[in-house]
Swiss-Prot record:
A Gene Ontology BP annotation from the UniProt entry: photosynthetic electron transport in photosystem I
Comment on bound cofactor: Binds 2 [4Fe-4S] clusters. Cluster 2 is most probably the spectroscopically characterized electron acceptor FA and cluster 1 is most probably FB.
Protein name per the record: Photosystem I iron-sulfur center
Membrane topology category: Peripheral membrane protein
E.C. code: 1.97.1.12
Length: 81
């Protein structure tokens, strides 16, 4: 089943989500819009197992990273018709 990993602009570049991911779905990439000059990216979403450890590791008040599991993807992201 396919999962969607969404990274929001509230990412503070702390790398906690990257370190928490057991399947190396995430990586940090340079970004000038972040205090840390880097932001999380999810180039390998096909490897996501949906464990949501990245969400749990995120220290921001509003989770900067969210994993939407299969069928909940369009509904949770507000894309359902």
């Amino acid at each position: 089943m396919s999962h969607t990993v969404k990274i929001y602009d509230t990412c503070i570049g702390c790398t906690q989500c990257v370190r928490a991911c057991p399947t190396d779905v995430l990586e940090m990439v340079p970004w000038d819009g972040c205090k840390a000059a880097q932001v999380a990216s999810s180039p390998r979403t096909e490897d996501c197992v949906g464990c949501k450890r990245c969400e749990t590791a995120c220290p921001t008040d509003f989770l900067s990273i969210r994993v939407y599991l299969g069928a909940e993807t369009t509904r949770s992201m507000g894309l359902a018709y």
